[in-house]
Amino acid sequence: MTVIAWDGTTLAADKRAISGGGICRTVKKIERFDNCLLAISGSWDVGVELREWFKKGAIVNAFPESARKDEATLLVVGHGGLATYASGPYPMSVEDTRYSTGSGRDFAEAAMYLGKTAREAVEVACVFQSDCGNGIDEIVL
């Protein structure tokens, strides 16, 4: 229900969110915050809780209980690298130059492996993954 791609310079994401019985909505999954870029995938409500927890300082003892179910991922991209938060308050640092997440990640990973940009990778995923689409947002770090 999401595809988010990072190519080392640009973060891109589709805009489709599916609620209830399959109604599609258009949303923004990525944003700039201070000196980093944030992206959420998975359950929208849980992802937003993770994002807001991070923006308030990522206090370990204040980690959202709903996130412990591992239904969403928060991606944080900064000049120091890339990290993800999922079911706990400690990030997983990712050393790879390229990264993608969400249901369209395999298509995006393959596209970037073949030299496509993050935006182009999201475009490819939106063609082949039926729950990705509704446009693309992108932010350059």
Specify the residue positions occupied by each region the protein language model found.
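N-terminal nucleophile
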Residues: 1-141
